[in-house]
A protein has these predicted regions:
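The feature marks the mature, well-folded catalytic cores of soluble enzymes
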Residues: 1-309
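Intrinsic disorder at enzyme termini
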Residues: 7-12, 19-35, 45, 409-502, ...
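Generic, well-ordered alpha-helical scaffold segments in large soluble proteins
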Residues: 73, 77, 81, 97-101, ...
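Short coil/turn segments at secondary-structure boundaries
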Residues: 140, 183, 267-271, 398-402, ...
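Amphipathic alpha-helical surface "interface" segments used
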Residues: 190, 273-280, 407-411, 445-451
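Ferredoxin-type iron-sulfur electron-transfer modules in oxidoreductases and energy-metabolism complexes
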Residues: 282-310, 325-439, 482
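Short Cys/His-rich zinc-binding micro-motifs
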Residues: 313
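Extended amphipathic alpha-helical segments enriched in small hydrophobics
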Residues: 316-320, 366
Length: 522
C-alpha cells in the first residue's frame, strides 16, 4: 500500500467510523466555521481579491507550461548558493537519496518541520526502518506522532484532538503532570523539543515555494519550529515537489497574500523564512550543508493530462474548510494524507484508480471548493473527470454496472419503461412502514439499505406522469376554451352594447331635427 493511503479499509467503513465520532464532527464544524469566518473577513478587505486569484492562477499555469525551464533555473541558482540539488523521479528514489545523505553523515536522528511532501513519500517510517529517528517539531505533528495517528487536515493535522485528550496523551506517553491549559502543554512540549533542536545534526523541512530567480526555499509556519529546524542543525535537507516553484520574488508576494489568508484566515503567518543556500563565512547561524531533493512522483504525468490544473495547488486547505462532505466524514474518512476535495483529485493521480476507485464519489459536486480555491482549480470538473475515467476503465463493481445497464435498457425501451413504472409503485408501497415511507424497516434489503439506514424514501405515485399530463392538458385545454368563449361572449356583448348605444344616439339626434311642415312655415 502506498504511503499516501494510510487506511486500506473500504470507503464505506471509513465513513461509518467517522460518522460515529461525535467529537470529530464538532471539531471539524468549529474549525470550518472559525477559519472560514476569518478568511471571509480578510478577503472582504481586499478589493481586488478576484484579480489576485486570477493572477495567481496565471503564475502557476505559466510555471507549469515552462516547468523544465524553471526547474533548471531554480536548481542552477540553488547550486550557486552552495546547495546540492537532487532530482528524484519516484518516491523510492527520493527516500534512497535522503538515506544516502544520512549514511554519509553518520546521523541517526533528525528534527523535522511539517511537510506534506515527506508524508507523501513516507519518510518517517522509512527512516525508522533504517534506525534513524525523525522527530516532528510542529506541535500538531508531534501530537499525532506521539499518538501514532494519521493527520485529519493538511494545515491543522491534529484537529481531531481536544485539549483534554492531548493532556492525557502526554501524561501517558511523556510523563506530563500539568493541566489541559494549551499554554502549559506548549511549554512542556518546548522542554522536550528544545534539546532536540540544539543537539540535532540534521534538519528536514519542506518548501512552500522555491524561487527560481534566487534559488531560495521558503518556509511558512506559525510556531517558528521550521526556522529552528533550518537554522540550528549543521545540515538541512529540503524535500519539495518539483512543481512548487514561482518565477521570482514578486510572484512569491502574490502567492503569500493568498496562501495565509486562505489557509488560516490571517494576513501573515507567525514565521516566514526565505532560505538561500548555505551559511556564509560572516553569518552566525544557518546550515553548513543544504541538500534539496526535488520529487517528481508522477507530477510530470499529471502535467501532460487533463488534470494539469491540479498542479496549481498551494496546499492551503481552503477547499476542505468549505466542503460539506469533509465536514461530515472528517479527514479520516478519506483514508489519504490528502483529504477533502483536493485529495479526491490528487490521491487517484498519485496512487491509481485500483485503490481509490470509490474516492471521487465522496463529493456532492456543490462547487464550494472551486469558489474558495485561491488559484482557481476547477476541482468539481476534475472530480467528475475521475468518475468518467473510472467508468470507462471498468473500475465499477459488477452489481453497480449491471444495475445501470438494466436502467439504461429500461429507460431506452418504451415497453420496458411502461412495465417498470406500472409495477414499481406497488412494490414500493408494499415496502413502506408506519410512516407511509420506505424507512429503516427495509434495512435487510441490500443496496436500498444504504439509503434507508439514515433517511426515508417516498414511494412512487401510482398515477404516471404521462397520465397526469394528458389529463392536465385536457383540463387546461378545456379551461382555455371556456376562457376563450367567455372572452368572445364578453367582446360580443361589448360590441352589442356599443351598437345599441350608437343607435340610441342616432335616434335622439333624428328627433331633434326640424320637420318639413315647420320649414314651410318659416
Amino acid at each position: 500500500m502506498s504511503s499516501i493511503i494510510y487506511d486500506d479499509a473500504p470507503l464505506e467503513e471509513r465513513i461509518h467510523r467517522s460518522l460515529s465520532d461525535t467529537f470529530k464532527h464538532r471539531a471539524i464544524e468549529t474549525a470550518q466555521d472559525v477559519i472560514t469566518g476569518k478568511r471571509n473577513a480578510l478577503v472582504a478587505e481586499v478589493e481586488n481579491w478576484e484579480e489576485f486569484r486570477d493572477h495567481a492562477a496565471e503564475i502557476r499555469d505559466h510555471v507549469l507550461a515552462n516547468l523544465d525551464y524553471y526547474v533548471k533555473e531554480f536548481a542552477t541558482n540553488a547550486q550557486k548558493n552552495g546547495a546540492q540539488v537532487y532530482f528524484a523521479p519516484t518516491d523510492t528514489d527520493a527516500l534512497d537519496c535522503i538515506l544516502d545523505i544520512f549514511e554519509d553523515l553518520g546521523a541517526t536522528s533528525c528534527v523535522k518541520s511539517k511537510s506534506m511532501m515527506t508524508e507523501e513519500i513516507g519518510l518517517n517510517k522509512f527512516l525508522e526502518k533504517h534506525g534513524i529517528s525523525a522527530i516532528e517539531t510542529d506541535c500538531a505533528e508531534h501530537i499525532i506522532q506521539t499518538a501514532g495517528n494519521a493527520p485529519s487536515h493538511i494545515v491543522v493535522p491534529a484537529l481531531h484532538f481536544d485539549r483534554t485528550s492531548i493532556r492525557d496523551l502526554y501524561r501517558e506517553r511523556k510523563g506530563y503532570t500539568g493541566s489541559d491549559d494549551p499554554e502549559e502543554i506548549t511549554r512542556f512540549l518546548r522542554t522536550i523539543l528544545r534539546p532536540e533542536f540544539m543537539n540535532a545534526s540534521v534538519g528536514v523541512t519542506g518548501c512552500n515555494f522555491g524561487v527560481a530567480e534566487t534559488g531560495s526555499c521558503t518556509l511558512v509556519s506559525n510556531e517558528g519550529n521550521a526556522r529552528m529546524a533550518s537554522s540550528i542543525p549543521e545540515t538541512q535537507i529540503i524535500v519539495m515537489g518539483c512543481e512548487r516553484i514561482v518565477p521570482d520574488l514578486r510572484s512569491l508576494d502574490v502567492m503569500m497574500k493568498l496562501l495565509v489568508r486562505s489557509a488560516v484566515g490571517a494576513k501573515i503567518s507567525g514565521s516566514f523564512s526565505i532560505n538561500t543556500g548555505c551559511r556564509r563565512e560572516n553569518e552566525a547561524d544557518g546550515p553548513k550543508n543544504v541538500h534539496i531533493v526535488m520529487v517528481n512522483n508522477g507530477r510530470t504525468n499529471i502535467l501532460g493530462s487533463n488534470f494539469k490544473p491540479m498542479l496549481r495547488c498551494i496546499r492551503c486547505g481552503a477547499c476542505m474548510n468549505s466542503c460539506p462532505v469533509y465536514r461530515h466524514i472528517t479527514g479520516h474518512g478519506y483514508g489519504s494524507i490528502y483529504p477533502g476535495p483536493m485529495g479526491i483529485v490528487l490521491t487517484p493521480l498519485l496512487v491509481g484508480y485500483k485503490e481509490t476507485a470509490k474516492l471521487p464519489y465522496a463529493c456532492s459536486l456543490c462547487g464550494s471548493c472551486a469558489d474558495v480555491c485561491p488559484v482557481k482549480i476547477p476541482l468539481p470538473d476534475l472530480i467528475a473527470q475521475h468518475r468518467r475515467n473510472i467508468v470507462s476503465l471498468g473500475y465499477v463493481p459488477p452489481a453497480e454496472k449491471a444495475a445501470f445497464s438494466a436502467a439504461a435498457a429500461t429507460f431506452s425501451n418504451r415497453t420496458l419503461y411502461g412495465i417498470a413504472t406500472t409495477v414499481a409503485p406497488s412494490i414500493m408501497k408494499a415496502l413502506t412502514g408506519n410512516t407511509n415511507q420506505i424507512d429503516k424497516s427495509t434495512t435487510f434489503i441490500p443496496v436500498l439499505n444504504g439509503w434507508t439506514a439514515s433517511r426515508n424514501l417516498d414511494p412512487m405515485n401510482k398515477e404516471k406522469f404521462r397520465t397526469w399530463f394528458a389529463h392536465h392538458k385536457q383540463e387546461r385545454n378545456a379551461a382555455q376554451r371556456t376562457k376563450a368563449a367567455r372572452e368572445i361572449s364578453a367582446a360580443a356583448s361589448r360590441v352589442h352594447n356599443a351598437a345599441e348605444k350608437n343607435l340610441n344616439t342616432y335616434k335622439a339626434d333624428e328627433t331633434s331635427l326640424p320637420t318639413s311642415s315647420t320649414r314651410k312655415e318659416d
